[in-house]
Amino acid sequence: MSVLVVGMSHQSAPVALLEKLSMDETVQNDTCRAMVSAGSLSEAMIISTCNRLEVYTVTNSFHSGVQDVVHNLAEVSGVEEEKLRSYLYVRYADAAAEHLMMVTSGLDSMVVGEQQIIGQVRTAYQFASEQGTVGPRIHALAQSALRTGKRVHSETEIDEAGSSMVSFAFDQALSRMGREDLAGKRVLILGAGAMASLAATHAGRLGAHLIIANRTIARAERVAQHAHEAGVYADVIDFSERAQALRDVDVAISATGAQGFTITAADVERYHVADRELMLVDLSLPRDIDDAVAEAEGVDLINIERLNNSLQAADTDLAAGTSPHAQARRIVSEELESYASEQRVRDVVPAVSALRKRAANLVQCEVARMEQKHPELDERQMGDINRALKRVADKLLHEPTVRAKQLAANSGTVSHETALQELFGLQLEGSGVAVDMAELPDAAQMEAAENTKEEKDA
């Protein structure tokens, strides 16, 4: 039995499809119960946000488990299974655990380091627990993931990563525009999520006049209201008017993750005024703005992929492994190793229990046989024999029981011969040679030694 995650996010699927799979609490609970009623699934937890839909289950069969999850998602969303499969990703066993830890830490978010996802994972766990679809494996994974997320946010500065990206985008844009601020400039913001809100805040601080557009106008109005409260002038326009707005703005920033482009080359060709400089900034993955827009005269484009490359190239902390992102990845690795070790030990417990139960049954059988064969033995004598046999069985099994858990905790694999020696602490003459892998020469050392030998032979 292993943990399986089947899901999609802003990185793998268009927003329109994510919206079809989005689940409220009732649908989430019903779907969890439907999942565990499938023959291959025994536990289920669903994380549903505006940028992500992920189903965490425990399965006894990888392929059947994936099929059952996809079938249930198709039933709930009304989207054909074949279409779902083209956007879904699958992680299994330790890879599934690592994925949830990355998600909970904010390392897989559109705005890296955002903390809201911790609460969303906790809520998903609570919903599933209340429905009785959480068992020991998802419980252990959820607790490990939540602990990982807390560590990442308390021990690193990953919280600032998203704002750093937006800040860097503005630095790059201002540098190309030859300006120090945006005073007197009009900035179009497309989107109303975390990244778009950060962009609006930053543009406002630089003195820009904001124009906000979002598919849901109420969300655009909330962003504008926050700007007003900060003393920044902001208008709201209908999302369908975004292309026309290119006539009057100096900068357009898109952070929607929408299906298809929010700004196309045709939009720029039709509405951009040739003698007016236009800076376009794409903060979305997948991309919001068509790369072809940069071919138009007077138009410049910055996108998040180029920003990431430039930011990493300039980040000496990242190169040294001391950046918040690198530190966060190390924490995830530590927690994953701890979780995986605990799970391997937990997996061996049933076998150890079965071994002890078998030994106890053998003791009982031998005591019964002795009692039948020697009726002259009184109750005290039979008690002594029973206790003696139990002590022998306990002592014989103690070392292999302890060593079995130690071997399970170690992720390395061992041969059957080595396993027997390790379990029972056996020292067999001539059975093998103990080798410390750390003492073996690496490929470069072996090649150097071979070259030296050839020189001597020559």
Curated annotation (Swiss-Prot):
Binding positions for substrate per the UniProt entry: T49, C50, N51, R52, S109, E114, Q115, Q116, Q120
GO biological process: protoporphyrinogen IX biosynthetic process from glutamate
InterPro entries according to UniProt: 4pyrrol_synth_GluRdtase, 4pyrrol_synth_GluRdtase_dimer, 4pyrrol_synth_GluRdtase_N, GluRdtase_CS, GluRdtase_dimer_dom_sf, GluRdtase_N_sf, NAD(P)-bd_dom_sf, Shikm_DH/Glu-tRNA_Rdtase
Alphabetical keyword list: NADP, Oxidoreductase, Porphyrin biosynthesis
EC number, as in UniProt: 1.2.1.70
Positions of the record's site feature: Important for activity: H99
Pathway assigned in UniProt: Porphyrin-containing compound metabolism; protoporphyrin-IX biosynthesis; 5-aminolevulinate from L-glutamyl-tRNA(Glu): step 1/2
GO molecular function: glutamyl-tRNA reductase activity; NADP binding
Keyword flag Nucleus: no
Sites where the protein binds NADP(+): G191, A192, G193, A194, M195, A196
One Pfam family from the record: Shikimate_DH
Domain of life of the organism encoding this protein: Bacteria
Other comment: During catalysis, the active site Cys acts as a nucleophile attacking the alpha-carbonyl group of tRNA-bound glutamate with the formation of a thioester intermediate between enzyme and glutamate, and the concomitant release of tRNA(Glu). The thioester intermediate is finally reduced by direct hydride transfer from NADPH, to form the product GSA.
Protein family (similarity comment): Belongs to the glutamyl-tRNA reductase family.
Domain notes: Possesses an unusual extended V-shaped dimeric structure with each monomer consisting of three distinct domains arranged along a curved 'spinal' alpha-helix. The N-terminal catalytic domain specifically recognizes the glutamate moiety of the substrate. The second domain is the NADPH-binding domain, and the third C-terminal domain is responsible for dimerization.
Summary of subunit composition and partner proteins: Homodimer.
Function: Catalyzes the NADPH-dependent reduction of glutamyl-tRNA(Glu) to glutamate 1-semialdehyde (GSA).
Name this polypeptide is given: Glutamyl-tRNA reductase
Organism of origin: Corynebacterium aurimucosum (strain ATCC 700975 / DSM 44827 / CIP 107346 / CN-1) (Corynebacterium nigricans)
Name of the gene encoding the protein in the UniProt record: hemA
